[in-house]
Amino acid sequence: RSRGLGDVYKRQSIKEERVMMEQNNLKIITNPIVNQSLCTMRNKNTDTEGVRLAARKLTRILLYEATKNLPQKDIEIETPLTKFKTKTINPDITIIISPILRAGLIFTDEAVDILPQATIRHIGMYRDEKTLKPVWYYNKVPMPVDNPENYYVYITDPMLATGNSLIEAIRLYVDKGIPETNICCV
């Protein structure tokens, strides 16, 4: 029996699934809205406005999940009726949204709506077609950073191919002393 492309993809998918199951820092989000948004974004017949709307929905869901471990602070606020004890994102931390140019920009507007206190730090790389290695051409990440343990970074890049650009982006922040546990790829 000859093997078709479907068999190759199936084997590769099973292998990738095993690798993903071994990762304890990988979160796969599955729900109907995520699936519908991905379907809309991938459909060649979707117009630009449709892609943007689907990306906004997807960004919101992904960031809600990605930010659930941000440090919080207990505060007391005054409501129209009484005082109320609650929690808020710790104002002593620095949140960075770091889109990898250009594809990562599609997540930026929604990310800033969700995290208005975040700073945007663009990073730009392209893939050398011969070596498949990333080549830097733009970096707006400050050097050095004070109190790197108080930084929380969300790297946005929907166009994952080899993963080398994402690895380089993570390395950029780790080299500044930011703990890997404080870096999330969306």
Regions picked out by a protein language model, each given a short descriptive name:
Residues 14-186:
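PRPP-associated nucleotide enzymes
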